[in-house]
């Protein structure tokens, strides 16, 4: 009886350990998983690891995963997306920030005008300017600069060396290349002998901070999932470019020694190899099932944009799949899904419900935010819309939003009241 109890406890502990390992693997990024599998295959004789195509060097089929991990340098896009994930919690903010990220050149500067980004995102110019101010605070300083002067001024301000003379020199930096130091001295209102000292202050600044990152046509780590729009709707599949392969070499067990202790250790290693293979299979299955639910629930969002998000929480997805909400959280954390037009974070598919007028059908928080933002952004500045007018327009568009919700989200978006907007327009 006591022996049976002990065996049962051991089995329970073993199952708990395997479950924790599975959850840990589910939460790993493609890069972290590659490192983990490399380490496991190095130490476990019953495992062979085949890196996914995204990690395979061009030199041939022999892939040194350890060397690749050591030499890894993140892509500029991956670096920026990580910061966007941390900086913004609202889906409209994240999507607008991603529009800016897509406009980045390898240098780290913006490759598109603010007007074109605002137009593509469907937001006002002032909203785009506010977003740019936040993004220009990302590391390394100088990212999202509009030109060379903008980049150097951002860095000089960060380094606390942005005097009037330094800013003037930066804005007229072409005069240095043209050796027109006397003209530069006149502009800076200083002696020509002071110019070399001012130049010295900005010499350490990095004119192209984006070049510190890898620059491949696609991110170093492509999205884990791919969504495709077909005639019958959206379908989801795992991205084979990021899907690793491990093989459990059962045949190697017979090659072992007859020593009892050594055989016990080999049995343990074989069991760990099997558990890892199962955990990897569960990871892929959970990612695929989770993404399938998100795409099915938010197909209108994918087809038409943020205004068509429906309320959806981690708990909703977990309930549909028969899993815990924390498991879904691990599955979507930091993950991207690629559509025909762009890559989106899985977090963008979630949105909370908001208060509705007269207890109508639930509206997602993000669709309400997006509607208020687009409506105010497109109004006649001389005749701004009141909150009641926005409620009426929302009803005509099929969104039943309470007036207090409109007022709250207008404030969240940094939009003044209709009275204040009218006064501001009259003052211009």
Swiss-Prot record:
Keywords: DNA-binding, DNA-directed RNA polymerase, Nitrogen fixation, Nucleotidyltransferase, Sigma factor, Transcription, Transcription regulation, Transferase
InterPro entries in UniProt: RNA_pol_sigma_54, RNA_pol_sigma_54_core-bd, RNA_pol_sigma_54_DNA-bd, RpoN_core-bd_sf
PROSITE patterns: SIGMA54_1, SIGMA54_2, SIGMA54_3
Annotated protein name in UniProt: RNA polymerase sigma-54 factor
DNA-binding region boundaries: 313-332
Organism of this sequence: Rhodobacter capsulatus (strain ATCC BAA-309 / NBRC 16581 / SB1003)
One GO CC term, this protein: DNA-directed RNA polymerase complex
Keyword Transferase: yes
Any one GO MF annotation of this record: nucleotidyltransferase activity
Family to which the UniProt record says this protein belongs: Belongs to the sigma-54 factor family.
Gene name for this UniProt entry: rpoN
Transmembrane annotation, as ranges: none
Keyword Nucleus recorded: no
């Amino acid at each position: 009886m006591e022996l049976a109890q002990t065996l049962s406890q051991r089995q329970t502990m073993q199952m708990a350990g395997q479950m924790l390992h599975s959850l840990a693997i589910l939460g790993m990024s493609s890069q972290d998983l590659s490192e983990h599998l490399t380490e496991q295959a190095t130490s476990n004789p019953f495992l062979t690891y085949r890196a996914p195509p995204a990690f395979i060097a061009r030199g041939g089929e022999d892939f040194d995963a350890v060397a690749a991990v050591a030499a890894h340098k993140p892509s500029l896009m991956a670096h920026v997306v990580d910061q966007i994930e941390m900086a913004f919690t609202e889906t409209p903010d994240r999507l607008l920030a991603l529009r800016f990220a897509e406009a980045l050149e390898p240098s780290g500067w913006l490759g598109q005008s603010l007007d074109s980004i605002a137009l593509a995102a469907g937001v006002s110019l002032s909203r785009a300017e506010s977003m740019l101010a936040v993004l220009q605070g990302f590391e390394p300083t100088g990212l999202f600069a509009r030109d060379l002067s903008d980049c150097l001024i951002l860095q000089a301000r960060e380094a606390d060396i942005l005097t009037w003379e330094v800013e003037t020199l930066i804005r007229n930096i072409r005069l240095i290349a043209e050796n027109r130091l006397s003209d530069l001295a006149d502009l800076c209102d200083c002696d020509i002998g002071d110019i070399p000292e001012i130049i010295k202050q900005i010499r350490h600044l990095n004119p192209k901070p984006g070049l510190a990152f890898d620059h491949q046509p696609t991110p170093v780590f492509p999205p884990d999932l791919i969504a495709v729009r077909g005639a019958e709707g959206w379908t989801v599949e795992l991205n084979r470019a990021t899907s690793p392969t491990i093989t459990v070499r059962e045949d190697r067990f017979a090659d072992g020694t007859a020593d009892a202790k050594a055989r016990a250790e080999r049995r343990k290693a074989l069991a760990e190899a099997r558990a890892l293979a199962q955990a990897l299979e569960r990871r892929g299955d959970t990612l695929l099932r989770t993404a399938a639910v998100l795409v099915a629930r938010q197909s209108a969002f994918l087809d038409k944009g943020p205004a068509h998000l429906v309320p959806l929480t981690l708990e909703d997805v977990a309930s549909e799949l028969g899993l815990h909400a924390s498991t879904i959280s691990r599955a979507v954390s930091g993950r991207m899904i690629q559509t025909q037009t762009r890559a989106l974070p899985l977090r963008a598919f979630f949105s909370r419900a908001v208060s509705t007028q007269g207890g109508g059908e639930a509206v997602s928080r993000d669709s309400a935010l997006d509607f208020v933002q687009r409506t105010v952004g497109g109004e006649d500045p001389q005749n701004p819309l009141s909150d009641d007018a926005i409620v009426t327009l929302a009803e005509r568009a099929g969104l039943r939003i309470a007036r207090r919700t409109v007022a709250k989200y207008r404030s969240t978006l940094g939009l003044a009241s209709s009275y204040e907007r009218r006064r501001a327009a009259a003052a211009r």
